Amino acid sequence: RELWVSNHISDSVSVIDLDELKPTFMHVIATIQDIDSESKATRFDEPMGIAFADERKAYVALSSENKIAVVDVATRKVIKSLTIPAQDPRGIMVRNDRLYVIPFESNNKTQLSGGYKIDGKLVTFNAHEHSIANNNILSLGHVTDIVKHPRVPDRDLFVFDVKTDKLIETVDTLGTLLYGM
């Protein structure tokens, strides 16, 4: 019996032994990370939610990577990753052979008008230029409008088949800031 804990800041998952009969009871018995051997950079950035397909395969939401790491439970190694075409996946769960993933920021066809351009026509003014690039003080109380545009995606829930790890469905119009399931 184990407890897997995501360490959002330290880019890892700690595996804690819950077997009261073992001397390692309530101790970290493994740390799951994924470091690129050449660059020495993490490929396991900001883990959040954890869900298990079964006793062999786990999923870990990597919020800043916009990916889900697929972890072999026995070896505790990342075997592949699933790309989430939305920002900051956090909430995940497995039910009936389906992996459900929700991103924290899903857009809902909206964008701050001061945000960077998507198609060159969405930004009513460039808040980055106004507040950051050309302003040597923090613009307290700076206000931007929210612009709705049909080309900005609205992707709220991603459904994967846990046997194939293939994306099988995307659901929209659930909300803008999605905190969990």
Task: Specify the residue positions occupied by each region the protein language model found.
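Beta-rich, blade/repeat-based domains predominating
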Residues: 1, 35-53, 85-95, 174-181
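Conserved beta-propeller blade signature
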Residues: 2-5, 57-60, 99-101
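Short loop/turn segments that connect beta-strands within beta-propeller blades
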Residues: 18-21, 72-76, 161-165
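A short beta-strand motif characteristic of beta-propeller blades
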Residues: 24-40, 77-82, 166-171
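Beta-propeller blade signature
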Residues: 76, 122-123, 147-162
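Short, conserved, GDST-rich strand-edge loop motifs in beta-rich repeat architectures
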Residues: 102-151
